[in-house]
Amino acid sequence: MKKLARFGLGLALLASLGTPALAHDDATLDAMTTPNGGQLRMAGAYHLELVVVQDSPTPRENPVTVYLTDHADQKLPAAGAKGKVTLLSGKQKTEISLSPAGDNKLSGKGSYASSPTLKAIVAITFPDGRTEQARFTPLLPKVPNHSPHGPQH
């Protein structure tokens, strides 16, 4: 009877582990359709969606927006949060301060060109003082998800 109880306990423990964390790798996040047309990344307990201008062939003053959600895609209030986006394209580096812009949105402006090689590092400091960071390649072409079930969240 003890062996059966241990087996049942072990089985219950395995079942409680759920699906692998691979459901949140960058490739899976890139295949997801985002609410604002940006690129999605995980940062700690949060999802950050980075939206940059896609049609600026030369560097000029352009907006940058980061949307904050939790892993259940529920909006997180941006009030009291602040952030910084570092954009890298070729030899050009641009740092843009982000401030709350309503609802779950932080935004700022800075000079950058829309390039498929554009890379971004986003750092968000939440009202409780915790800072989360994520890396993006926001203008890389999307790769379709070939899973018959679509991207899993």
PLM regions and their residue ranges:
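Intrinsically disordered, low-complexity terminal tails/loops enriched in metal-binding residues
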Residues: 2-5, 17-153
